[in-house]
């Protein structure tokens, strides 16, 4: 219900009716709409973070970029309601997470992978969080676009996004500059 109508437009009465339970049961188990929403968001976050963590656990840097991109976009395709709840959330107090928390969690994990790779390649590891957040932001934005477009296939989109990310990372200068300043 949250995915279809949004947090604000969904009432406890509607949730109870849809679940074929009484309102007091919702209040007893979740404390109200905010508590239920928090459980839904936390469940979705746990699922998508686990999928991405599995995707980046092993493999070459390129494989990790490709697999994590495909894992997230597959989540968007296969769990549209969960993605909608996180992407078009509720008041910040309603959940312990939400899209911002998800992005930070995933970016931290990707940043750890980048930090190790940067150290091994002679790059400044302090820059790793910048690149991790940039990559996560790009993939998330494309995921939001895809929820409206529904084409091309998630696999096709993942190939293009991963190629852009990989080519950028592969040709990353050790000391980036702005062309306007040269």
What label would you give each PLM region?
Residues 1-35, 39:
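Helix-turn-helix
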Residues 46-49, 95-119, 129-134, 156-159, ...:
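Amphipathic alpha-helical packing segments from all-alpha helical-bundle domains
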Residues 14, 35-44, 51, 86, ...:
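Alpha-helical DNA-contacting segments of helix-turn-helix folds
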Residues 73-97, 108-115, 144-148:
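Amphipathic alpha-helical segments used for helix-helix packing
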Residues 39, 53-78, 135, 158:
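Hydrophobic alpha-helical connector segments
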Residues 172-182:
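C-terminal effector-binding regulatory domain of bacterial HTH transcription factors
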Residues 4-8, 79, 121:
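Short coil/turn segments at alpha/beta junctions that flank glycine-rich nucleotide-binding fingerprints
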């Amino acid at each position: 219900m949250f995915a279809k109508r949004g947090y604000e437009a969904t009432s406890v009465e509607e949730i109870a009716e849809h679940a074929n339970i009484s309102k007091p049961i919702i209040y007893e188990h979740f404390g109200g709409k905010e508590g239920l929403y928090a459980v839904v968001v936390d469940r979705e976050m746990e699922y998508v973070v686990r999928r991405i963590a599995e995707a980046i656990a092993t493999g070459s840097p390129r494989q990790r970029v490709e697999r994590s991109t495909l894992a997230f976009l597959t989540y968007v395709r296969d769990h549209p309601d969960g993605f909608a709840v996180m992407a078009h959330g509720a008041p910040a107090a309603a959940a312990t997470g939400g899209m911002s928390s998800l992005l930070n969690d995933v970016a931290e994990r990707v940043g750890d992978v980048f930090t190790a790779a940067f150290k091994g390649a002679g790059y400044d590891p302090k820059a790793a969080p910048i690149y991790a957040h940039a990559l996560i932001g790009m993939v998330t934005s494309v995921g939001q676009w895809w929820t409206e477009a529904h084409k091309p296939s998630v696999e096709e989109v993942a190939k293009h996004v991963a190629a852009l990310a990989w080519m950028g990372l592969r040709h990353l200068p050790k000391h980036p500059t702005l062309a306007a300043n040269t």
